[in-house]
Amino acid sequence: LYEDDAEYWMPYEWGQKSVTDHVSLFFEDKTLLRMRIDRLKNDLSPLEWPPARTNRHLSNVQITEDTGDRVTATAYLAFVEYRREEQRWFSSRVTWSLHTEGDSFQIAAKRVDLLNCDQESGHLRFATPM
């Protein structure tokens, strides 16, 4: 789904304009994203046991730009994680930059703006909302 040079960004501040001006919760390329996914799927990772059960709900999907070979889309995401008798909810606005190739799309960039991005703790261990 992701282009080889894709970027996945989760800003630390609401309305953050640039990845270089401030620390981010996540700023990963395809290699780091793959490492995170592999770690979450690894049964030998004690910090990830038992594995989280997750649910995602997208709503209000909109195409905000279409240049023919590039499409920008936004949506609202409700992400629920249940693990170790704790259920946590995350709400966010997601923006995708998609590269079109024939009848398919590849993700060139993904930005996830968490509603509670600036809370003091709790983001470090949640499963990546793909």
Predicted regions located by residue number:
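A solvent-exposed, acidic/Ser-Thr-rich amphipathic alpha-helical stretch
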Residues: 3-74
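Short, cysteine-centered beta-strand-loop-beta hairpins and adjacent loop/turn segments enriched
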Residues: 79-89
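Solvent-exposed residues in well-ordered beta-strands and their adjoining turns
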Residues: 64, 78-80, 99-101
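A short local loop/turn or secondary-structure capping micro-motif enriched for an aromatic residue
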Residues: 17, 81-83, 115-118
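Compositionally biased, intrinsically disordered linkers/stalks adjacent to structured regions
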Residues: 124-130
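Short beta-strand edge/turn micro-motifs at domain boundaries
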Residues: 72-74, 91-124
